[in-house]
Amino acid sequence: MLEARDLYCERDERTLFRGLSFTVDAGEWVQVTGGNGAGKTTLLRLLTGLARPDGGEVYWQGEPLRRVRDSFHRSLLWIGHQPGIKTRLTARENLHFFHPGDGARLPEALAQAGLAGFEDVPVARLSAGQQRRVALARLWLTRAALWVLDEPFTAIDVNGVARLTRRMAAHTAQGGMVILTTHQPLPGAADTVRRLALTGGEAGL
């Protein structure tokens, strides 16, 4: 379980949120919503330990995140707004970098992400959407319980969004957890996704 307790965050003397508390249990996914500058990416960075809140605490499995950072990161898949891939490598080589023991599974993961036939193309030659898919192919390889995804559908077409949404639904159905930001509707998932709205100051599920 991931838990936020009474989080407070301020940027440039402006309060992004205060008193923010919620939990994400096994089998749940949460969509963080809010306008530009509302603090969506900042919140994800706090939840992953990449930044510290100005007040409050994040907990993992009942322990303060700062005390269990190593075990937490073994349970985490974080994909930020930037793809975080190496443009000089091919799609296959990028996945191998993150998942060196899964060589036989790499082609299928890339196919699931819509990159069949592009496995050995240098990433620098791929479109922005295809580069995003290289990063998201990790969703078919990772064993992490918690997925935190910042705008995963950027530059992804409608069919790709549907495919990725189905993968997230399968992950939560197996007891995984998903937290994501997106401005796009989640096809077929409206009844299962909890929404956390950041509106400046207070926030609520």
UniProtKB/Swiss-Prot annotation:
It is a peripheral membrane protein. It is found in: Cell inner membrane. Keywords: ATP-binding, Cell inner membrane, Cell membrane, Cytochrome c-type biogenesis, Membrane, Nucleotide-binding, Translocase, Transport. Its main location: membrane. Disulfide bonds: none annotated. It catalyses: heme b(in) + ATP + H2O = heme b(out) + ADP + phosphate + H(+). GO terms for molecular function: ABC-type heme transporter activity; ATP binding; ATP hydrolysis activity. It comes from the Bacteria. It holds the Pfam family ABC_tran. Part of the ABC transporter complex CcmAB involved in the biogenesis of c-type cytochromes; once thought to export heme, this seems not to be the case, but its exact role is uncertain. Responsible for energy coupling to the transport system. The complex is composed of two ATP-binding proteins (CcmA) and two transmembrane proteins (CcmB). Belongs to the ABC transporter superfamily. CcmA exporter (TC 3.A.1.107) family. This is Cytochrome c biogenesis ATP-binding export protein CcmA 1. The gene is ccmA1.
